Swiss-Prot record:
Protein's gene: Cebpd
Segments of this protein annotated with the region Leucine-zipper: 226-254
Protein name, per record: CCAAT/enhancer-binding protein delta
SUPFAM superfamilies linked: Leucine zipper domain
Assembly behavior: Binds DNA as a homodimer and as a heterodimer. Can form stable heterodimers with CEBPA, CEBPB and CEBPE. Directly interacts with SPI1/PU.1; this interaction does not affect DNA-binding properties of each partner. Interacts with PRDM16.
Positions of the UniProt region annotated as Basic motif: 195-222
Function recorded in the entry: Transcription activator that recognizes two different DNA motifs: the CCAAT homology common to many promoters and the enhanced core homology common to many enhancers. Important transcription factor regulating the expression of genes involved in immune and inflammatory responses. Transcriptional activator that enhances IL6 transcription alone and as heterodimer with CEBPB.
């Protein structure tokens, strides 16, 4: 009775527990020969459960690639080069995908190639065996060229004029400059020429000092003279002020004479 109910060839009936979900990734149960389809098989669940790859969506880059190849602004980079690189990349990617899908032998690793695993993967720009692997380098070179041209087009502030490279002027090394600077020194201290220069320098210094002293003395003498004259002028002003005050007092003390004509009359 129990053997008939739980046989492997007949479906299980009357079980009080719910049916377990099918194990999609158990290799032991999928590859066993001589077993029929179970009730929880992938074929039966396909109509009720959503597909495994419904959420995944493939992105078609052909429109972007064609638009990039047709852009006329990239004058520095050749458009045919972009088109050839993109087409060769697509062809290589398609051939690799067919080879992996058909289950053929993988390409043996050679010089400049990388051995691919049994799992399928999308073509990467960094793969050394892809013919389109030179595209990022070409794009980087073009971008650097555009940036350098844009920087050269911008006005730069004027700098100090530099001598032209083709000028016949001698280019002196630092050692030569030092030697020349060392050669410009004066004569030795014990030589008569050095003594003569030193005497001339001392005489010039003495003359300048004496001239400054004379100017200082002259200024001091002028200052003394002007101070004395100023003092004399102050004394003169004080004397005149005192005389004026005495005259006023004298005229105030005099009596008015009766024979004087009235004010405003012409006396002759």
């Amino acid at each position: 009775m129990s053997a008939a109910l739980f046989s492997l060839d007949s479906p299980v009936r009357g079980t009080p527990w719910p049916t377990e979900p099918a194990a999609f990734y158990e290799p032991g149960r999928v590859d066993k020969p001589g077993r029929g389809p179970e009730p929880g098989d992938l074929g039966e669940l396909g109509s009720t459960t959503p597909a495994m790859y419904d959420d995944e969506s493939a992105i078609d880059f052909s429109a972007y690639i064609d638009s990039m190849a047709a852009v006329p602004t990239l004058e520095l980079c050749h458009d045919e080069l972009f088109a050839d690189l993109f087409n060769s990349n697509h062809k290589a990617a398609g051939a690799g995908g067919l080879e992996l899908l058909q289950g053929g032998p993988t390409r043996p690793p050679g010089v400049g190639s990388v051995a691919r695993g049994p799992l399928k993967r999308e073509p990467d720009w960094g793969d050394g065996d892809a013919p389109g692997s030179l595209l990022p380098a070409q794009v980087a070179v073009c971008a650097q060229t555009v940036v350098s041209l844009a920087a050269a087009a911008q006005p730069t502030p004027p700098t100090s004029p530099e001598p032209p490279r083709g000028s016949p002027g001698p280019s002196l090394a630092p050692g030569t400059v030092r030697e020349k600077g060392a050669g410009k020194r004066g004569p030795d201290r014990g030589s008569p020429e050095y003594r003569q220069r030193r005497e001339r320098n001392n005489i010039a210094v003495r003359k300048s000092r004496d001239k400054a002293k004379r100017r200082n003395q002259e200024m001091q003498q002028k200052l003394v003279e002007l101070s004395a004259e100023n003092e004399k002028l102050h004394q003169r002003v004080e004397q005149l002020t005192r005389d004026l005050a005495g005259l006023r007092q004298f005229f105030k003390k005099l009596p008015s004479p009766p024979f004087l004509p009235p004010t405003g009359a012409d006396c002759r």
